[in-house]
């Protein structure tokens, strides 16, 4: 989800959009006619999606910490991705009018620091939680569970089950 947010403008340039139109409609945004930078409504929708992505990252951290500490390789793989995703979400939040993924790309030094810290703390769940809190500091956070509409289930059927409208996902080409 983080890469979808980061790469929104590159995807758009090649004729693809993976953002949920249902969510952006609430902000008065038609993704098919979106100008570069998107404007205020688009940025508000992106902030909401950052909150949802942040919630997913927290769930992924909980899952990762269920992996035994002796399984250093798989933990490290997951932790690097989680740390970089959190830092990328912060960059997107800090630069809401970005028009290219390169403008919100995590620096090489931040990548190296994320890897070093994750490697150091890989077996220490409490330290990993503190590191994640630092990486995710200031990010909005969607509340509660974040259900996703299963593939093949139309939005109307999903809404009928009383799933929160702001949490519906969609995608595809524009």
Segment roles from a protein language model:
Residues 1-13:
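Acidic (Asp/Glu-rich) catalytic motifs at the cytosolic membrane interface
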Residues 10-174:
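Catalytic cores of Mg2+-dependent Asp-rich isoprenoid enzymes
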């Amino acid at each position: 989800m983080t890469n979808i947010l980061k790469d929104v403008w590159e995807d758009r340039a090649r004729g693809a959009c993976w953002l949920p139109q249902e969510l952006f409609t609430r902000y008065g945004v038609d993704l098919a006619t979106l100008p570069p930078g998107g404007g205020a409504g688009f940025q508000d929708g992106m902030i909401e999606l950052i909150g949802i992505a942040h919630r997913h990252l927290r769930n992924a951290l909980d899952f990762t910490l269920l992996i035994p500490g002796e399984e250093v390789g798989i933990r490290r793989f997951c932790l690097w991705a989680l740390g970089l995703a959190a830092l990328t979400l912060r960059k997107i939040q800090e630069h809401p009018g970005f028009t290219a993924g390169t403008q919100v790309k995590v620096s090489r030094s931040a990548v190296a620091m994320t890897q070093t810290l994750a490697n150091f703390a890989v077996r220490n769940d409490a330290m990993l939680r503190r590191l994640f809190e630092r990486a995710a500091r200031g990010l909005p956070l969607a509340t509660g569970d974040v259900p996703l509409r299963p593939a093949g289930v139309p939005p109307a059927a999903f809404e009928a089950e009383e799933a929160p409208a702001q949490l519906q996902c969609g995608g595809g080409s524009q």
